[in-house]
Design a protein with these regions (language model features):
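Alpha-helical linker/edge segments of TPR/alpha-solenoid repeat scaffolds
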Residues: 11, 49-51, 76-89
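Short coil turns that delineate tetratricopeptide repeat
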Residues: 30, 63-64
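Helix-start (N-cap) detector for alpha-helical repeat units in TPR-like alpha-solenoids
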Residues: 33-34, 66-67
Length: 89
């Protein structure tokens, strides 16, 4: 299955189904930064921030120009804004 076909399939899938399908795809295609970014976005949408960031970092390691770079930047800005009291007690 190609990634664009998988994206259509997971569009209506539950979080667990989508992540399982993406994980299977990533296992078979470990160099696919777009798949890692897509899985990271599903993690982010489910509130699993650390899993999302790990996927973004893995995607950037594969392809520094990956759109995961922008996703990571946005995630960092959101976390910095939302958790300022944790960093500056």
């Amino acid at each position: 299955m190609q990634l664009h076909e998988l994206k259509e399939t997971i569009r209506t899938a539950t979080y667990e189904e989508a992540v399982a399908a993406l994980t299977d795809y990533i296992t078979a295609n470990p160099g696919d930064d777009e798949a890692l970014t897509t899985r990271g976005m599903r993690h982010w949408g489910a509130g699993k921030r650390s899993l999302a960031i790990n996927d973004y970092l893995a995607a950037i390691a594969i392809n520094p120009a990956s759109r995961a770079r922008e996703a990571l930047r946005a995630a960092t800005e959101i976390l910095d804004y939302r958790n300022t009291d944790l960093y500056n007690p």
